[in-house]
Regions:
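ABC ATP-binding cassette signature C-motif
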Residues: 1-91, 150-327
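Flexible nucleotide-interacting loop at or near the entrance of a catalytic core
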Residues: 84-172
Length: 327
């Protein structure tokens, strides 16, 4: 918020924002959206928040294939337009390939036939004029995120009674109670992320609290914290760090390398120290850990933070398909 205030102060001619919604709560993002919509000058923004892009942006600059292309419209319009263009290009190539095959068969069949030689020559000229459009593979890559629960949930998930949490002497959660049922996928929202993070930490016994938190006896929980710095304080490689969460059957270099490859860590990248990973890489490593643990309850505190749009899409798909409970 302080950095945003600094950038916005003085009404600049051009406002450059790199991931401005990272770390902001819902109310702050909504305020920023309204501010930018009314902002009269130029705004150039990099963001992985597609809802923010849809609401604020009038143009999309698509950087892919090593080139940049400008679209008029918001994120959804760009996505639909680019996907339609790719489908049309593929359809044109498919029709061209079909025509090439047809002409090649005619030339091969009748080129030695005197009565058909002129037609064969004509077809050969037509064949030489047909060109396939080059379809360059996208530079965008999607990780494979698939959460499986080793054990089904029983009849109870979570009961919270009279929960209170203080941070530095200030009450952030005051006497709250709720019950969640097996299979529930629950989003927690609040006035600020201090409250929701305090709740997540209390549920995972990662902070002192007053009150009662009772998990069902059949639950097994995996936690993705907002602040994962403690998880990556060692100098271990990605491969060795992840190995500690693998089962005996999975504790194999071939398996772990393949597993990490699906999470976009290929080749020697698995030997990188976890302490030097970027924010997005750390979240992908944490998600890899959660997949290996196979818990039936996932507790995720702002899991899309630092992830790119491709990883967010893959995470969305993985969470929708997850048969356990989600907080």
């Amino acid at each position: 918020k302080v950095l945003l205030a600094k950038a916005l102060f003085g009404k600049p001619d051009v406002l450059l924002l790199d991931e401005p919604t990272n770390g902001l709560d819902i109310q702050s993002i909504s305020w920023l959206e309204d501010f930018l919509i009314d902002f009269e000058n130029t705004v150039i923004v990099v963001s992985h928040d597609r809802h923010f892009l849809n609401k604020v942006c009038t143009h999309m600059a698509d950087l892919d294939f090593g080139k940049i292309k400008l679209y008029v419209g918001n994120y959804d319009f760009w996505k639909q337009s680019s996907e339609l263009a790719a489908r049309l290009q593929a359809d044109r190539n498919a029709k061209a390939e079909e025509k090439i095959k047809e002409l090649q068969e005619f030339v091969a069949r009748f080129s030695a036939n005197a009565s058909k030689s002129k037609q064969a020559t004509s077809r050969k000229k037509m064949l030489d004029k047909i060109e396939l459009e080059e379809i360059v593979p996208s530079s965008r890559k999607y990780p494979f995120i698939n959460f499986k629960a080793e054990r089904e949930l029983g009849k109870d998930l979570l009961t919270v009674e009279n929960l209170s949490v203080k941070i530095d002497g200030e009450t952030v959660l005051d006497n709250i109670s709720f019950i969640l049922r097996p299979g529930d996928k629950t989003a927690f929202i609040g006035q600020n992320d201090i409250q929701t993070t305090a709740l997540m930490r209390a549920l995972m016994d990662d902070i002192e609290y007053e009150g009662t938190i009772k998990w069902g006896v059949t639950t097994s929980r995996s936690y993705l914290p907002k602040d994962n710095s403690r998880d990556f304080s060692s100098g271990e490689s990605i491969l060795e760090w992840l190995r500690q969460f693998a089962s005996k059957e999975e504790d194999d270099n071939t398996f772990l390398r393949g597993f990490l490859g699906r999470m976009l860590f290929s080749g020697d990248e698995v030997n990188k120290s976890v302490s030097v990973l970027s924010g997005g890489e750390k979240v992908r490593v944490m998600l890899s850990k959660l997949m290996l643990l196979k818990s039936n309850v996932l507790v995720l505190d702002d899991p899309t933070n630092h992830l790119d749009l491709e990883s967010i899409t893959a995470l969305n798909d993985g969470l929708m398909a997850f048969t356990g409970s989600l907080l």
